[in-house]
Structures are given as structure tokens and as C-alpha cells.
């Protein structure tokens, strides 16, 4: 700059001094400028004041020469000091050139700019608040300055500005929040520290309600919470803690819905502190906001469910997640099963996409997880000024989204045991609270629920059975026409069973056991489908039948009607084409029937056959039990049909006696010695009235080889008393015994013919397999 150039009212000496490289000379020039401006102020000469500021700005502060810029900065500061309380009229002209120097490449010049702005702000105090955003923007950049002197200077200016904001009641929070939202996504540690420090200050000012704008900055706060610096993490943790305290104090004014998806995202963070903090917030939101959170249920479950399988290393997160899960579950009521006439209001309807609306976060952060599809996945920054009364608007349950999340967790092989248990608890809860809506999803859920029966955990299987039992017994699942197994959705397992024809039971005296599965008020159209598909699963997974079959059926007998289960399975097995499986399944069912404490009442019902219903059940079981000869005999023992048992054993001579057959006879002998057949053993005392029982037992004895079972049964039969010893009291006993009523005549001849027919089928199939095996062997030899 030409020092001789006319820059009046600045004198040539002042101009030369301002351009000097020596700081002391520039300082002297600044004092002269201060005197000059004071004189103009006393004269109220605003034109000259503006002219001086313009010269210092254009000719010095914005000059290409570094020393001139330094002179301009100190000159502008001198003007501000001279103006005093009147500096507010000229703040824009004073501040803008100084802020421009914040971007200077020379660190010394940036330091002088800090110093100049400090003096300007110190004089103006509250008058600078209308320019707060530009000051904050400049300071946020200097907070990350690599030069320690510049950073130190910016910190002094920062403290001064915070004091001014704290003292003032005219802070423009509405205008400041967009800038704060933008700057909060900085990745620089110093910039983050600067942002958090300002949030803490604003939180502490009583007249500033930052809580209203929390949805705008909450995501950024959680981003900062993951910073590598412990100090910054601690500051952010304190800030979030203060916000949460305010939320608890004033829940009615909190915009819970606008922050729900932010929490959902951060509840899935891989950073433990972020996840624990977000989960803690979610817990409080669920308890404070209640049903306002229902539209976000699927997203919440997406975040919470995996945490339930955490080990002790993340015990805190697991415990909080469990509370969140329980709280969310309690929000669902039977009213949610009503018609969908009440729609979500626009205020509570979640938006379509979080990332598209969050204009700033999309530039600064990438989320590794995706939320479930609409409507549980959004935040709309446009609603920041919406009234808090939005939280009281009616909400509806998005059951489709919830079921989608639950179904996905059941399908994923990596899902932990506790999570699977919780998913099944959720399904059971939904079938209890919202059965009508849940049955819309039953066809899609049925296959995975059946597959879950193969889970390694007994507890998972128990919960799965509870869900299946509720599906099979809920009145909401009853349809006008019983759904045939051939109508199941694609991919649903089914047995190859002919459609059972509905036979109207004749009023005659002979009972036929070929009717379809029972239809009772407690069973719906899904019950028969469940039985068909359960047997199909046992057929395809013999290991499941072997290891868990008895456990599953026994639990079902506790959850459902045992008679219906056995009646239905017997009816299905009667039409089973895989005869080997049918025999194995009958053997398992028979063992359960005879040994399980859960079936005590059913055994008592079959033991006496005193009602037409019990006789009908016996006939139904008998026809399927014919797939397994020894099981058929044991059923006759249970029902005290000793003569028919003897007749069956007589037919055993025509059967193919295998090792498996003899093993089953051995097990039956062992079973006769158990408490279940105590009544049978006592009946051996009444020799004359139970001759066929003794004959049947001797028949079993003759079938057995010389083994431990043979010795056991032989010793038992040796204890049978001599009929002659029992004869003296026989007449008296016979006269006192009332004749046993026969509630319905059972055609035992027809049943025996059915037994022969079924066993002939088994023999034919075995011969076919044997012949095919021999033919294959001959071909291999040739």
C-alpha cells in the first residue's frame, strides 16, 4: 500500500504506522485512531466514523499485504473501544473483516484476528447477539486450529461469548439451532469439544429451552459419544444426562416421536457406551411416552431383541434391553385388536426414511444397520416446531412390522437362545392380546414355528409349543370350513393323507372308529393342520422324534386336550402311507400313553370304557395302534380287553417275529411290573373271572426267548393262585359283584379283522423291500 495515499481522516503517520511490521508502531497507530474516533463520537459524526471503519476494513484488514492486515485488525479493535456502547451500530462493519482473517494462512494473523474480535465483543457485550451465528461459525473453525496460540486466543473469546449468552435474555435459539445441527457432525475432536461445551452452557441457562430442539441435535450427540477422547465422551455423557433429567421433569413437552428412530439406530451401535446410553433413553421413553412409541415397535424390537442374548460382558445393556422389551410388551392391549378405523394422525405417523430427511447426518455418518420397512423408520426435521400435544394423539399398532421382525429373528440361524425365547413370548403375547389380527399372519408363521421344534434348547421348544397350542385352540382361529391339509400354503409341510370324509355317526349300537379328528369348542381349524404337520416333521426328522418326540407330545397334552391330540394323531396315522413310520409313531404314542403322568386322566378314561366317548376313543386308537402289534396288545391290557388281547396274541404266530418285535414284547413285560398296571396284577388273583388275562400273559411268555424278561413274567405267573384255593368264596363274591354295564357294543370281530388287514399290509411292504434288495444285489453281482 502507498503510504502517501490520501486516506483521510487517517493521517499519513497513522497509515505508515499501521503498515509497519513492528507491533509497537501499529499499537501507537491504534491509539491515535482511538483518539480520532472518540472525537467523531463526541461530534456525533457518524459519517466519518463509518468512513474510518471502511478504510480500516477495505484498505488494511482485507489488504494483500500481511502487515497491513495486522494493522487493520488492531485499528478496528481501537474503533470499537472508542465507540464504547455505541459500537452496536457498527458491529457488522467491524466484525465481518475480522472474521475473514480467521481463514488467513498466517497463524500470527489469525491470532491477531482473535485478539481484535475479543476486544470488539468485550465492548459490545449483548449487542453482538444478533451476529452470534457468524461469531459461532468462526469460533468453531478456530477451535480446531493447529496453532496452540490461535487455539488459546479462541478459547478466551469463546469464554467471553459464553458469559454474554448466559447473561442475556435475548438469545436467538431458533436461528442458532440449524447451525448447531450442522456443526455437531464434525469429526474433529476439538470442534466436538467446542460444540459440547456450548450445549452444556445453553442447557444451564434457565431462559433457554434447548429441550424443544433436542430432536435436531440428538443424533449428533450420540455420534460424539463415540469419540476416541475420554474427556469428550464424558462431556457428552454429562450433556445427555442433563437432557434426560429435563425429559423426566417435563415429559408433556417432549417430542418423543421425533426422537424414537434416532434411539433405535443408536441402540444397535457397536460402541458399548452409545448402545447402553441409547437403550437407557429408550427405557425412559417407553415408560414416559407410553403408547406414543407403539408406531416404532418394530424398530425398537429390531434393536432390543439381539441384546437379550448378550453375555455377562454386556450385562448392563442386556438388563436395560430386557426392561425395554417388557415395557413395550405392556403397551399392547386387547383394544389393539379392534378394527383399523382409527388411523394414525399425521403428527404421530412415522416418516418413510430417516436418512433422506436428516440432511446433515447423511453427509457425516453412515449407519451399518437398516430399520424394518415402513412405518417404523424415520425422523422428520421439519416437525421441530410441532406442538408437544402431538404426543397425545391416538396411535395404532403396526402389527405387520412387528411380526416381520419376529419372523426374521426366528429364521436367522445366528439368533441367540434368549432372543428366540423372547420372540416366542412376543408371538404368544400377540396371539393373546390381538388374536384376530395375528391370525392373518398364521399361515406365514406356521412353517417356522414347526421348524423351531427342532431347536437345541428345551426352553425354546416349550415356548414354541405354547404359541402353537394357542394357535390351535384360540377361538379367533375358528373358520366356518375346516381347512384341509391340502390347502396349506406353498412350503408348508404336510402328510400324504387322503381327505377324511365326514361320516355321520349312525344311531345303531355298533361303534365304528373311523370318524375324523374330534371337533370341540376348544379346538379350531388350525388344530388338525397342526397335528398333520407335526407328524410330518416327525416323519422327516426321525432324530427329532427319537430325542424330543415324547417331550413335545407330553407338553402338548398339558397345553391342549390330551384326548383330542391322541384322537387326531390316531386318525391321521390310520391313513399314513409310510407304514414303517406309522408303526414307530404308534410305538412312541403308546409309550407316552402308558407312562406319562400328564395322561393319567386319559388312562383312567380308557381303563373302564364306561361312556360312549371312551369307547369311541378306544376304537379310534385301536385302528391306528394296529400298525404295531405289541402296542395294540398293551392298549387292550390298559382297557381291560383281555379276551381280545389273547386273540391278538394268537395271531402273532402268523406275524414275522423280528428282533425289534421281541424287544417290544420285552418292554411290555417290564411295563406290566410298573405301578400303572397294578390293577392288572391284582386281577390275577381273580383267576376264574380273568382267564383270558392269564392266557394272554402266558402267550407273551411263550413268545419270549429265555431271557430276563422271560424269567420276570414266569415268576409273576407262578404267583397266580390255584383256582381251587379261591373257590370257597367264589359264589358269594360273584353274587355281590354287579354286572358291568356296556355303554356301547364294540365289534371286536371287526377290530380283529382290521388288525389282520393292517398287518398284512406291513408284511407285503416288507416283502417288497426285501425283494427289491435281492434284485439289486443280483444286479451288482452280475
UniProtKB/Swiss-Prot annotation:
InterPro entries for the chain: ARM-like, ARM-type_fold, Vac14, VAC14_Fig4p-bd
GO biological process, any: phosphatidylinositol biosynthetic process
Primary location group: membrane
Record's compositionally biased regions (Polar residues): 357-375
Region (Disordered): 334-375
Record keywords: Endoplasmic reticulum, Endosome, Membrane, Microsome, Repeat
Protein name per its UniProtKB record: Protein VAC14 homolog
Source organism per UniProt: Xenopus laevis (African clawed frog)
Gene label: vac14
Amino acid at each position: 500500500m502507498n503510504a502517501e495515499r490520501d486516506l483521510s481522516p487517517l493521517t499519513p503517520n497513522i497509515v505508515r504506522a499501521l503498515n509497519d511490521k513492528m507491533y509497537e508502531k501499529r499499537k501507537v497507530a491504534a491509539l491515535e485512531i482511538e483518539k480520532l474516533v472518540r472525537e467523531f463520537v463526541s461530534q456525533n459524526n457518524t459519517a466519518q466514523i463509518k468512513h474510518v471503519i471502511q478504510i480500516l476494513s477495505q484498505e488494511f484488514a482485507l489488504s494483500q499485504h500481511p502487515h497491513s492486515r495486522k494493522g487493520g485488525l488492531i485499528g478496528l479493535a481501537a474503533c470499537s473501544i472508542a465507540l464504547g456502547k455505541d459500537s452496536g451500530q457498527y458491529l457488522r462493519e467491524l466484525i465481518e473483516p475480522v472474521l475473514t482473517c480467521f481463514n488467513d494462512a498466517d497463524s500470527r494473523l489469525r491470532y491477531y484476528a482473535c485478539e481484535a474480535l475479543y476486544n470488539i465483543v468485550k465492548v459490545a457485550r449483548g449487542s453482538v447477539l444478533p451476529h452470534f451465528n457468524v461469531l459461532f461459525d468462526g469460533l468453531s473453525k478456530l477451535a480446531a486450529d493447529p496453532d496452540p496460540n490461535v487455539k488459546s486466543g479462541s478459547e478466551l473469546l469463546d469464554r467471553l461469548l459464553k458469559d454474554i449468552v448466559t447473561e442475556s435474555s435475548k438469545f436467538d435459539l431458533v436461528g442458532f439451532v440449524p447451525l448447531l445441527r450442522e456443526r455437531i457432525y464434525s469429526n474433529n475432536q476439538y470442534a466436538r469439544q467446542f460444540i459440547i461445551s456450548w450445549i452444556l452452557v445453553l442447557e444451564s441457562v434457565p431462559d433457554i429451552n434447548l429441550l424443544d430442539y433436542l430432536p435436531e441435535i440428538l443424533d449428533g450427540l450420540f455420534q460424539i459419544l463415540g469419540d476416541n477422547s475420554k474427556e469428550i465422551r464424558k462431556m457428552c455423557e454429562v450433556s445427555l444426562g442433563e437432557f434426560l433429567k429435563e425429559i423426566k421433569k417435563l415429559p408433556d413437552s417432549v417430542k418423543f416421536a421425533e426422537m424414537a428412530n434416532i434411539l433405535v439406530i443408536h441402540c444397535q451401535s457397536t460402541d458399548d457406551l452409545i448402545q447402553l446410553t441409547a437403550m437407557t433413553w429408550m427405557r425412559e421413553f417407553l415408560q414416559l411416552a407410553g403408547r406414543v412409541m407403539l408406531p416404532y415397535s418394530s424398530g425398537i424390537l429390531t434393536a432390543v431383541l439381539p441384546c437379550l442374548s448378550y453375555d455377562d460382558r454386556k450385562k448392563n445393556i442386556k438388563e436395560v434391553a430386557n426392561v425395554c422389551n417388557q415395557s413395550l410388551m405392556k403397551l399392547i392391549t386387547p383394544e389393539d385388536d379392534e378394527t383399523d378405523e382409527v388411523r394414525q394422525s399425521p403428527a404421530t405417523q412415522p416418516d418413510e426414511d430417516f436418512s433422506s430427511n436428516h440432511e446433515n447426518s447423511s453427509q457425516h455418518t453412515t449407519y451399518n444397520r437398516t430399520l424394518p420397512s415402513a412405518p417404523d423408520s424415520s425422523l422428520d426435521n421439519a416437525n421441530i416446531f410441532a406442538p408437544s400435544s402431538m404426543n397425545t394423539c391416538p396411535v395404532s399398532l403396526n402389527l405387520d412390522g412387528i411380526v416381520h421382525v419376529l419372523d426374521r429373528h426366528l429364521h436367522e440361524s445366528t439368533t441367540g437362545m434368549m432372543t428366540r425365547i423372547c420372540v416366542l413370548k412376543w408371538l404368544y403375547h400377540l396371539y393373546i392380546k390381538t388374536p384376530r389380527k395375528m391370525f392373518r399372519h398364521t399361515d406365514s408363521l406356521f412353517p417356522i414355528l414347526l421348524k423351531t421344534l427342532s431347536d437345541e434348547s428345551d426352553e425354546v421348544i416349550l415356548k414354541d409349543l405354547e404359541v402353537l397350542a394357542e394357535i390351535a385352540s384360540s377361538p379367533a382361529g375358528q373358520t366356518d370350513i375346516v381347512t384341509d391339509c391340502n390347502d396349506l400354503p406353498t412350503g408348508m409341510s404336510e402328510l400324504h393323507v387322503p381327505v377324511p370324509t365326514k361320516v355321520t355317526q349312525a344311531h345303531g349300537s355298533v361303534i365304528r372308529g373311523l370318524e375324523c379328528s374330534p371337533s370341540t369348542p376348544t379346538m379350531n381349524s388350525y388344530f388338525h393342520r397342526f397335528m398333520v404337520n407335526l407328524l410330518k416333521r416327525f416323519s422327516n426328522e426321525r432324530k427329532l422324534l427319537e430325542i424330543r418326540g415324547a417331550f413335545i407330545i407330553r407338553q402338548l397334552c398339558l397345553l391342549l386336550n390330551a384326548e383330542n391330540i391322541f384322537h387326531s394323531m390316531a386318525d391321521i396315522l390310520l391313513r399314513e402311507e409310510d407304514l414303517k413310520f406309522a408303526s414307530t409313531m404308534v410305538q412312541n404314542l403308546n409309550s407316552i400313553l402308558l407312562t406319562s403322568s400328564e395322561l393319567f386322566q386319559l388312562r383312567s378314561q380308557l381303563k373302564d370304557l364306561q361312556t360312549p366317548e371312551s369307547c369311541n376313543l378306544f376304537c379310534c386308537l385301536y385302528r391306528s395302534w394296529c400298525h404295531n402289534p405289541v402296542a395294540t396288545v398293551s392298549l387292550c391290557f390298559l382297557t381291560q380287553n383281555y379276551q381280545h388281547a389273547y386273540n391278538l396274541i394268537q395271531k402273532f404266530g402268523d406275524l414275522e417275529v423280528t428282533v425289534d418285535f421281541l424287544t417290544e414284547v420285552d418292554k411290555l413285560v417290564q411295563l406290566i411290573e410298573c405301578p400303572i398296571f397294578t390293577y392288572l396284577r391284582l386281577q390275577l388273583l381273580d383267576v376264574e373271572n380273568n382267564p383270558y388275562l392269564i392266557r394272554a400273559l402266558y402267550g407273551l411268555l411263550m413268545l419270549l426267548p429265555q431271557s430276563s424278561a422271560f424269567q420276570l413274567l414266569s415268576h409273576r405267573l407262578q404267583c397266580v393262585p390255584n383256582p381251587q384255593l379261591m373257590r370257597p368264596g367264589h359264589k358269594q363274591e360273584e353274587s355281590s359283584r354287579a354286572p358291568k354295564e356296556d355303554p356301547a357294543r364294540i365289534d371286536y370281530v371287526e377290530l380283529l379283522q382290521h388288525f389282520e388287514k393292517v398287518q398284512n399290509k406291513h408284511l407285503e411292504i416288507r416283502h417288497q423291500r426285501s425283494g427289491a434288495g435281492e434284485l439289486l444285489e443280483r444286479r451288482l453281482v452280475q
